[in-house]
C-alpha cells in the first residue's frame, strides 16, 4: 500500500481521521455505536454500526512522514480557530486563518473518505490526493464554506459525502455510478459546519 498523499511505500501510520484533541471538547459524549451509512442512487441504504469513539477512528492510508510532518503542522496551525468555532465562541477569522481552515477542511475530508466510505477512493481520484499532498492548499475547482451549525442533534459530529457525475440533459441518468466528476462533502463538528464542493466539468 502506498501513501495516498505522496505515493511513498514507506512506513504507514495510523492517522486519526479527526484530531484527538476534539474528544475532550465533548466530555458528555461517551463510547457508543456510531453509524456509517452507504447508499447509491436507487439502491437500498445500508447501515453499519461501529463501536467506540468516533474521535478514535484511524486509517492506514498515509505514511509516517506525511502524518508526522506537514499533516501534523497543519493540525496545530488550524487548532486555535477550530477550537473556538467548534465551541461556538465568538471570534473573528483572519484571511490567513480562513485559508488554513479551508486547507484543513480539505485534508480532513480526504482523510475521512477511506475511513467512512466503503468505496471512498472511487469518488476521489488518486490524482486529487497526489495534487493535495504536493500543494497542500484547497483543490482546484473547489469551493469551501464555513458556517455556524445549530442542528441540536445528540451527536457531536456528522459527515455526509456524495459523488458527483455530470451527463448531458438529453441523455438518461446513468444507472451505474462509475468514475465521478467530483464530490460534495459536509462535516459538522459541534457548532462548526464545513462544506466542500469540488468538481471538474468534462468536455463534450
What label would you give each PLM region?
Residues 9, 69, 111, 193, ...:
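Short loop/turn segments at secondary-structure transitions that flank enzyme active sites
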Residues 47-119:
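Catalytic cores of phosphodiester-bond-cleaving enzymes
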Amino acid at each position: 500500500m502506498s501513501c495516498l498523499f505522496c505515493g511513498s511505500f514507506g512506513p504507514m501510520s495510523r492517522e486519526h481521521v479527526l484530531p484527538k484533541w476534539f474528544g475532550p471538547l465533548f466530555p458528555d459524549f461517551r463510547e457508543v455505536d456510531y453509524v456509517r451509512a452507504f447508499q447509491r442512487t436507487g439502491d437500498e441504504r445500508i447501515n453499519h454500526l461501529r463501536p467506540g469513539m468516533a474521535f478514535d477512528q484511524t486509517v492506514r492510508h498515509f505514511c509516517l512522514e506525511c502524518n508526522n510532518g506537514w499533516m501534523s503542522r497543519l493540525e496545530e496551525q488550524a487548532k486555535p480557530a477550530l477550537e473556538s468555532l467548534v465551541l461556538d465562541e465568538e471570534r473573528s477569522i483572519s484571511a490567513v486563518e480562513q485559508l488554513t481552515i479551508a486547507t484543513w477542511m480539505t485534508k480532513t475530508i480526504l482523510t475521512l473518505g477511506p475511513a467512512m466510505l466503503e468505496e471512498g477512493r472511487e469518488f476521489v481520484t488518486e490524482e486529487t490526493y497526489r495534487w493535495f499532498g504536493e500543494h497542500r492548499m484547497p483543490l482546484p475547482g473547489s469551493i469551501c464554506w464555513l458556517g455556524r451549525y445549530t442542528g441540536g442533534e445528540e451527536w457531536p459530529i456528522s459527515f455526509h459525502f456524495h459523488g458527483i457525475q455530470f451527463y448531458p440533459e438529453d441523455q438518461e441518468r446513468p444507472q451505474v455510478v462509475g468514475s465521478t466528476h467530483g464530490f460534495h462533502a459536509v462535516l459538522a463538528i459541534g457548532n462548526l459546519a464545513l462544506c466542500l464542493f469540488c468538481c471538474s466539468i468534462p468536455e463534450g
